[in-house]
Amino acid sequence: MSEAPKKRWYVVQAFSGFEGRVAQSLREHIKMHGMEEYFGEVLVPTEEVVEMRAGQRRKSERKFFPGYVLVQMIMNDESWHLVRSVPRVMGFIGGTSDRPAPISDKEADAILNRLEKASEAPRPRTMYEVGEVVRVNEGPFADFNGTVEEVDYEKSRLKVSVSIFGRATPVELEFGQVEKLD
């Protein structure tokens, strides 16, 4: 008695910007061809990010791997052809063109854990670190450079030490009022 093959995770390259549509089309193709037994999840790994725009907190989604869709599947000729027949699919990543290699269980677990963490709390679009130098681009301290002393991601605010007349002055600013220096 042989064991049924295990579904493994494969990385499918899609046209950039069409990952969601490719995932949806793939799900529809699987149903249409009655191949549900060969496929598990079809994912476009994203995280919710928060950014300040015009003084407003805005939530948006950022893709972990732009241009890629993760597909849990049993690889055989039929499932391979089904994935390749979906519009805007460029191919599989890893292995050879006719025999793709799955990602390791360790890599798959790392991605799935990252997805779980991302669903818990939205992250800011821009990450700031204590000690980092930023430029103030709004308000009375516009065009001054300062050093980040504290970061409050909950409120999207920073405490920045700005040098005014040779003295370091702590200033509370919103994320949208500063920009990172390269």
Curated annotation (Swiss-Prot):
UniProt keyword annotations, A-Z: Transcription, Transcription antitermination, Transcription regulation, Transcription termination
One GO cellular component, as annotated: cytosol
Residues of the signal peptide: none
Q: Using the record's annotation, list all stretches that form the KOW domain.
A: 130-161
Q: Which domain of life is it from?
A: Bacteria
Among the record's GO biological process terms, what is one? DNA-templated transcription termination
Xref: Gene3D superfamilies: 2.30.30.30, NusG, N-terminal domain
Q: Which family does it belong to?
A: Belongs to the NusG family.
Known role = Participates in transcription elongation, termination and antitermination.
Query: By its UniProt entry, which HAMAP family does this protein fall under?
Result: NusG
Q: What is this protein called?
A: Transcription termination/antitermination protein NusG
**What organism does this protein naturally occur in?**
Vibrio vulnificus (strain CMCP6)
